[in-house]
């Protein structure tokens, strides 16, 4: 994320939930583009998960040590590449809540036995810039932006270089922090529903989430799936880093 000077791997080595393996969102994104956090090719994803010892039938619980941002994006990546949605979840509140509840952490090294992971891309879960542009007029789907209202309305400079301020025409704004509690757990489904009802019909399944670089959009996508169990998360993965590029 822009303006964040942290080393996730160092934090992981210092303490983690017993048995947890480390996943680097930045390093495991597409290295062939200058856009941040773009999805890797399917063959690269297979290599990444195989090297981590993850199998297709594994139950995956994802957590992070931030505002659930990385864990929600990782959750989305697993779904995009075909992991069973019933086998992928996010630890509510992440490591911070885990530690506050005095649960066990350690710094033990994890021995990994390589697997042979096979991906199956679901390209219906992503939108590209051309599809976003076409939708401005035909309005086939709603675009909901997870950034702050100040960034959405162009009242503050974008934190990334060579990216203008503003938002996608005809999109809606729901800052992702509005569906989280102060401890970074998700609000109750009734409260989440109220937030979405203010801008869209929560029975609508054709919702595409956007943000700065395709990360916080996944927080909203997960939240929306909690109040609409028929929804499959859809992301404009280039997000404003691509759309607002100068």
Descriptions of predicted regions:
Residues 1-246:
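Cytosolic catalytic domains that perform sulfur/thiol-centered chemistry
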């Amino acid at each position: 994320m822009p303006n964040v000077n942290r080393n996730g791997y160092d934090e992981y080595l210092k303490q983690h939930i017993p048995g947890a393996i480390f996943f680097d969102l930045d390093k495991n994104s597409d290295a062939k583009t200058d856009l941040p956090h773009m999805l890797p090719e399917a063959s690269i994803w297979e290599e990444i998960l195989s090297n981590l010892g993850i199998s297709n039938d594994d139950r995956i619980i994802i957590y992070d040590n931030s505002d659930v941002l990385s864990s929600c994006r990782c959750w989305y990546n697993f779904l995009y590449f075909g992991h069973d949605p019933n086998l992928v979840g996010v630890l509510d509140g992440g490591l911070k809540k885990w530690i506050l509840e005095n649960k066990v952490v350690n710094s033990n090294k994890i021995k990994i036995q390589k697997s042979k992971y096979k991906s199956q891309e679901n390209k219906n879960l992503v939108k590209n810039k051309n599809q976003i542009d076409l939708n401005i007029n035909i309005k086939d789907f709603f675009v909901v932006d997870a950034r702050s209202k100040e960034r959405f309305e162009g009242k503050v400079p974008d934190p990334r270089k060579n990216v203008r301020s503003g938002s996608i025409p005809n999109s809606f704004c729901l800052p992702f922090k509005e569906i989280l509690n102060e401890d970074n757990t998700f609000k109750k489904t009734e409260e989440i529903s109220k937030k979405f009802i203010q801008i869209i019909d929560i029975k609508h399944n054709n919702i595409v989430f956007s943000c700065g670089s395709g990360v916080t959009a996944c927080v909203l996508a997960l939240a929306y799936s909690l109040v609409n169990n028929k929804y499959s998360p859809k992301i404009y993965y280039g997000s404003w880093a691509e759309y607002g590029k100068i």
